[in-house]
Amino acid sequence: MLSSQTSSIFTVSRLNQTVRLLLEQEMGQVWISGEISNFTQPASGHWYFTLKDDTAQVRCAMFRNSNRRVTFRPQHGQQVLVRANITLYEPRGDYQIIAESMQPAGEGLLQQKYEQLKAKLHAEGLFDQQHKQPLPSPAHCVGVITSKTGAALHDILHVLKRRDPSLPVIIYPTAVQGDDAPGQIVRAIELANARGECDVLIVGRGGGSLEDLWSFNDERVARAIFASRIPVVSAVGHETDVTIADFVADLRAPTPSAAAEIVSRNQQELLRQIQSAQQRLGMAMDYYLANRSRRFTQIFHRLQQQHPQLRLARQQTALERLRQRMGFALEARIKQANQRQQRVSQRLSQQNPQPRIHRAQSRIQQLEYRLTENIRSRLSEQRERFGNAVTHLEAVSPLATLARGYTVSTTTDGKVLKKIKQVKAGDIMTTRLEDGWLESEVKSVTPGT
């Protein structure tokens, strides 16, 4: 029985050799993913380690001529992807793999590329604050570079329509995922700059995995954003997603919706500004009128205390100039208010808040009418008061009394003679008539009965 099986008997050496040949010929090169453990590098420069998963492990070797091409230093516990040949180490009969190339597995590779590019661009100064352009305030036209079918575009347009319906939006559609996406994004940025239609750009997309967002970690995209003459707001993924584009952009928004909030103005805020401007205008008019009224009162009191006709004429001239200046100032203010209201109305014309605008315009017209009537009434009242004051002062003027035939006599020391006992025979007195003075001597004094 033994003799019939003699041809099938293997020596240990032959067995190991046969198994090695079978493994190398049948398996060829394969890709293997696993976790590194027991990593060593002796003086020869070769790498020896174990690849394992939850239930199994295999010994690996990577010779110096191969590991020289690996761009990272393998670490214990690191997940890697290895391209290798399956073989058997004949002297010990150990099954092992000979690695030809190695790279971090899955997102580990992408994360490593991300960190390398981030460090490179940071060293070149592309992230420096001194290169950041300020955003226009307000924006007159917004450019959006994203997928025309993505949720990000819908969110951006929804926010812009709600906040600032009249703000023009230009969409530069592009792929945001896949091999062609970086090139398309770069061309869209360059096109927007060449056309010069908008003064701010939103570049972004909705959320996703690191692989989904990878187009915004592309060096070409980063350099295109940096070179853009139009300020760029990056809006990639969710708040926790940070891409290279975020570092290079002039401003990073946590989401596409937030980017739309940043570049737009609130329509309700514009209406509040109009109402505030109306209130300030009314207060300014009231203050101006009150100030002029006080000034007029002061002038009136001074005129009462200083009767001479020439000064009255000068004050009347000054008052007329003040009235004219006040009229010009009020007309200028009303004109400015009308111009401001017209500008605001033009900006809001496309937003169609017509009921509020009509009410605001009616209110302004009422204020203008009331203001004009108030000014006219005040001026008429002040003219009447001024005329009455002049008439009163003329009525009590000593000159008017003299004109009616009366005289005023004074002693030599200037005292007005009111009683007979102030003089005696022989005293000299001066008498004021309407057209001059006369000097006389008292001959006798006769008291009245």
Curated annotation (Swiss-Prot):
Group of enzyme by EC: hydrolase
UniProt cross-references to Pfam families, sorted A to Z: Exonuc_VII_L (PF02601), tRNA_anti_2 (PF13742)
CDD domains referenced in this protein's UniProt entry, alphabetically: ExoVII_LU_OBF (cd04489)
Coiled-coil stretches: none
Keyword Iron-sulfur: no
Listed EC numbers: 3.1.11.6
A GO term from the CC aspect: cytoplasm
UniProt keyword terms in alphabetical order: Cytoplasm, Exonuclease, Hydrolase, Nuclease
InterPro entries: Exonuc_VII_L, Exonuc_VII_lsu_C, OB-fold_nuc-bd_dom
Catalytic activities: Exonucleolytic cleavage in either 5'- to 3'- or 3'- to 5'-direction to yield nucleoside 5'-phosphates
Single GO MF annotation: nucleic acid binding
Main subcellular location of this protein, as a coarse class: cytoplasm
Cellular localisation: Cytoplasm
GO biological process terms held by the UniProt record: DNA catabolic process
Subunit structure of this chain's protein: Heterooligomer composed of large and small subunits.
Protein family (similarity comment): Belongs to the XseA family.
Annotated function: Bidirectionally degrades single-stranded DNA into large acid-insoluble oligonucleotides, which are then degraded further into small acid-soluble oligonucleotides.
Record's protein name: Exodeoxyribonuclease 7 large subunit
Gene: xseA
